[in-house]
Amino acid sequence: MPQLQEAGELTGTKDKDYNIIWFTEQCLSNVLRLETYAADAEREGDTELAEFFRRAQETSRKGADQGKELLGSRLAG
């Protein structure tokens, strides 16, 4: 079966817009997942690992914020 190339015809969402939505959702999911990982590390007394996950969580949060901002400006325009 040939691979279908979706460019927005089926979903009504252009790839570039879908990609922003996907990226933002993944960043938000990472923020939640990393909260669990940091809590696990803290429960085990591993402060270094907990801090590592908190830094990664902040990076994901920034990515989500940037994605939301970009998506918002594109939807408004």
Stretches found by the model and what they are:
Residues 1-77:
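Iron-associated oxidoreductase/ferritin-like identity signal
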